[in-house]
């Protein structure tokens, strides 16, 4: 079921594999270190490679880190079909089951945070015992009745249209608002992130924008009973800080760690603080 793809010379510490979640769909994972599992779910339209500066920090502190690249992105297979949060949550469950993961900390960034909420609301506690929501696009990324926060749906409609006519421009526009200011991240980091984003399929990029636009997770929040940390940039232009406050109000056993100097990319803008907070939470 699993095919070894990379020989790092230290197989007991670093494993890069493909895991089959359906008969014709394999997802790429990075599985490194030993200890309590920390499972990382990337945001739109990135891959598990975005966590490069988290892997080493977590491994050094004695954690096993499992980065899952969602279908349609990065090195994972890119099938046509559904890309809703239920599909992604099921993929994650299948991977954690095959790896026999228990007592894990599930950390999701942006769209990955929204998917992590859906997963945690359905999980019986067999796999995950803590939840970290990082700049999460939740409980709703778009405005709706009784929820006047973040983007209007029409703005996402425009993003979907641009994806099909000029995807590089879509990603360039996205990069301009990814951090607190356009110069918060250096050119090298921005170029690296852009390369990861371009590795996604155009179809998955659009389908996940539809999921981001249409999914309302407000009813999921009350179902989450595990300890939850909400890490969010005060200057986030993609997922406004209002969303963090709404998640805090809806998840009973949760608290917010604000990142005063960060936009959406808090894991890169305040890397040391981010890693320290995640390690502290995972080690409790």
Where are the predicted features?
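Catalytic active-site module of serine/aspartate enzymes centered on a nucleophile-bearing elbow/loop
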Residues: 254-284
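Flexible "cap/lid" loop of the alpha/beta hydrolase fold
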Residues: 117-122, 126-165
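Conserved HGGG/HGGXW glycine-rich cap/lid loop of the alpha/beta-hydrolase fold
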Residues: 25-81, 238
């Amino acid at each position: 079921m699993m095919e070894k793809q990379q020989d790092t010379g230290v197989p007991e510490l670093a494993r890069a594999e493909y895991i089959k979640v359906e008969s014709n769909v394999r997802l790429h994972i990075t599985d490194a270190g030993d200890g309590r599992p920390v499972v990382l779910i990337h945001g739109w339209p990135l891959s598990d490679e975005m966590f490069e500066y988290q892997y080493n920090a977590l491994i050094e502190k004695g954690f096993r880190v499992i980065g899952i690249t969602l279908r349609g992105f990065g090195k994972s297979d890119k099938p046509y079909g559904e890309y809703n949060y239920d599909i992604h949550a099921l993929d994650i469950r299948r991977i954690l089951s095959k790896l026999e993961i228990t007592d894990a900390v599930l950390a999701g960034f942006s769209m990955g945070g929204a998917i992590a909420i859906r997963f945690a609301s359905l999980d019986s506690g067999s796999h995950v015992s803590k939840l970290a929501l990082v700049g999460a696009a939740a409980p709703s990324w778009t405005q709706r009745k009784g929820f006047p926060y973040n983007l209007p749906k029409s703005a996402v409609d425009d993003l979907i249209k641009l994806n099909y006519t000029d995807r590089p421009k879509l990603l360039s526009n996205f990069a301009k608002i990814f951090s607190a200011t356009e110069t918060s991240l250096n050119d090298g980091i921005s170029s690296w992130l852009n390369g990861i984003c371009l590795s996604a399929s155009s179809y998955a990029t659009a389908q996940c924008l539809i999921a981001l636009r249409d999914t309302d997770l407000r009813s999921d929040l009350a179902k989450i009973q595990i300890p939850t940390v909400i890490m969010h940039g005060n200057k986030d232009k993609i997922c406004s800080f209002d969303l963090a406050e709404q998640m805090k109000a809806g998840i009973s056993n949760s608290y917010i760690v604000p990142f005063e100097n960060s936009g959406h990319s808090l894991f890169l803008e305040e890397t040391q603080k981010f890693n320290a907070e995640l390690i502290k939470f995972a080690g409790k």
